[in-house]
Regions:
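N-terminal regulatory/effector-sensing and dimerization cores
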Residues: 28-134
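General N-terminal leader/first-domain-start detector
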Residues: 1-40, 45
Length: 134
């Protein structure tokens, strides 16, 4: 997944959460003005190089988002609250529980699922290899 693809994936997640963007001087705040109790996600980025996402939100209704990762991409962060489920082609259905992580992803596809009333809280940094090679 290139960084641009990662940002498109994030936007699909935010739309599934019924969040809309508000551009700030230092990033973009995604939230639902009609339901502020559902939380928000703040995305700060240097286009083409890295993205920092801070999230604290509750899912309003079930949804899923497909993903396709071709180019190597590095993600690391801390997932403090929530329970994710995802399907990766060629692997059994998997889940994630709160943890710290660092993962290099390449040449995988699948789907991630979110479930109504699940609460998620975490922080993630995504890095393009172009940034790492500079």
């Amino acid at each position: 997944m290139s960084l641009a693809t990662h940002l498109k994936y994030q936007q699909a997640v935010f739309h599934g959460l019924h969040f809309t963007p508000c551009t700030l001087e230092y990033g973009t705040l995604w939230s639902n003005a009609k339901h502020p109790e559902r939380g928000s996600c703040l995305v700060c980025e240097r286009p083409g190089f890295y993205t920092l996402t801070v999230a604290d939100y509750t899912v309003a209704s079930d949804f899923s988002v497909p993903f396709l990762i071709r180019q190597p991409f590095l993600r690391f962060g801390s997932f403090y609250e929530g329970h994710t489920s995802f399907e990766i082609e060629g692997f059994q259905t998997s889940t994630s529980l709160p943890s710290n992580y660092i993962v290099k992803e390449a040449n995988i596809s699948g789907r991630q699922n979110w479930h109504e009333n699940e609460h998620y809280k975490g922080i993630e940094i995504g890095l393009s290899f172009a940034y790492l090679e500079k």
